[in-house]
Regions:
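Extended, alpha-helix-rich binding/interface surfaces that flank or overlap catalytic cores
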Residues: 1-3, 19, 30-94
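Short, charged N-terminal beta->alpha structural module
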Residues: 4-29
Length: 94
């Protein structure tokens, strides 16, 4: 019997409405596409507990101004999750 344990790859679910999904290229993950109730990404088996909303900097600016009501609804949906995050994707200089 082997004493080494091999880790299963992380299984990420990408929401089917995500227009430009993160590629996860070269990372030890398995990606599947599905419809999530909240967020753009989750973990397989934890779709109702874990949600990640991904925003590019330009999207975030829109969400804080002209699309604020929609963003507030997104945040309200995330409140019901055990683990939720909004990730802003931008260069460090920005």
């Amino acid at each position: 019997m082997s004493t080494s344990t091999s880790l299963m790859p992380l299984r990420i679910v990408v929401d089917s409405r995500e227009q430009n999904p993160f590629p996860f290229a070269g990372l030890p993950v398995v990606v599947s596409v599905g419809t999530l109730e909240a967020g753009d990404y989750s973990l397989a088996g934890f779709e109702r507990k874990v949600a990640v909303e991904r925003k590019e900097l330009g999207d975030l600016i829109g969400c804080l101004s002209v699309e604020r009501e929609r963003f507030e609804r997104e945040l309200a949906r995330l409140r019901g999750y055990d683990c939720a995050a909004v990730v802003v994707e931008a260069p460090v200089a920005d």
